[in-house]
């Protein structure tokens, strides 16, 4: 084999392997997104969270469920108490979300701070916030009820680094969960 021909074969193999790695990386990323969507939708179903996906992108809602429930731990602060009281919980029983107060706020952090209701209000918007308002709160930490003041407990500095697409998925998921009636869980809805 001539040197120029050998060089051509080596170059073709190299380019083919690089393209193959890039394609596999893209496939893996897509599969990763798909698996996060599946995990999010399965979690909601397993916990009895009835999602209203009509008119919404199911994959976006599923990704939002994954981010809210598996990554963000929003239930830990925005539900009081976060899980049902199962006496066998420490013996390996599966945890069960407190569905009656799911994300309706009411968790106390000292004498002056209580977590907010982030379920959809009567207008269908989570916490009564438009997408633009929600994005502003997450990006700046500014309290929507007290402009110029920061949210005291909310870990917004962590969430502000998320992509707009991820935050949109969270917003769409919060729009798709059931609202909780006013004053059911100790925190009035607006």
Model-predicted segments: where are they?
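Electron-transfer interface patches adjacent to heme c in soluble/periplasmic c-type cytochromes
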Residues: 28, 93-133, 157-167
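C-terminal capping alpha-helices of c-type cytochrome domains
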Residues: 128-144, 156-184
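Surface-exposed patches in mature extracellular/periplasmic domains of secreted proteins
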Residues: 74-79, 146-151, 181-188
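Ligand-binding pocket scaffold of soluble enzyme catalytic domains
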Residues: 14, 29-38, 45-46, 145, ...
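Extracytoplasmic
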Residues: 69-72, 113-115, 149-151
């Amino acid at each position: 084999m001539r040197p120029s021909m050998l060089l051509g074969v080596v170059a073709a193999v190299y380019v083919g392997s690089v393209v193959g790695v890039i394609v596999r990386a893209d496939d893996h990323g897509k599969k990763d997104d798909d698996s996060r969507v599946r995990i999010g939708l399965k979690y909601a179903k397993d916990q009895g969270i009835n999602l209203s996906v009509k008119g919404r992108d199911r994959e976006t809602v599923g990704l939002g469920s994954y981010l809210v429930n598996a990554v963000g731990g929003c239930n830990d602060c925005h539900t009081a108490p976060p899980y049902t009281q199962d006496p066998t919980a420490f013996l390996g029983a599966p945890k069960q979300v407190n569905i009656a107060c799911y994300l309706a706020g009411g968790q106390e952090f000292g004498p002056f701070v209580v977590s907010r209701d982030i379920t959809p209000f009567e207008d269908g918007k989570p916490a009564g916030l438009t997408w633009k308002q929600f994005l502003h709160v997450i990006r700046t930490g500014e309290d929507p009820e007290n402009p110029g003041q920061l949210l005291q407990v909310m870990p917004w500095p962590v969430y502000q680094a998320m992509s707009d697409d991820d935050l949109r998925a969270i917003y769409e998921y919060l729009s798709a969960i059931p609202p909780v009636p006013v004053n059911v869980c100790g925190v009035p809805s607006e």
